[in-house]
Amino acid sequence: MRKLVIQVPCYNEEATLGGTLSALPREVPGIDVVEWLIIDDGSTDKTVEVAKAHGVDHVVHLPRN
């Protein structure tokens, strides 16, 4: 099985993350699974909530930037 994980580092991206995620593919020819990984660098806004609302597969939360 071929899997692609798209990683997006974020810091206080509540206002822009939705548009970014909407532009990411969920299907890629020749790839069986596409997953999204958000790396939250200690955001103090609702970055993680926005990510989850857009169906992100994985969130890694770093406590500080």
Model feature map: region roles:
Residues E13-V28:
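Short, well-formed alpha-helical segments that are part of the catalytic scaffolds
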Residues V34, V48-N65:
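Conserved donor nucleotide-binding strand/loop of the catalytic core
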Residues K3-V5, E35:
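Cell-envelope/extracellular polymer assembly enzymes that use nucleotide-activated donors
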Residues D40-V48:
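A conserved acidic beta->alpha catalytic loop
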Residues R2-K3, A23, H58-P63:
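Non-transmembrane catalytic domains and loops of membrane-associated enzymes and transporters
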Residues P29-E35:
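A generic structural motif
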Residues Q7, I39-D41, L62:
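Conserved sequence signature across two-component system core domains
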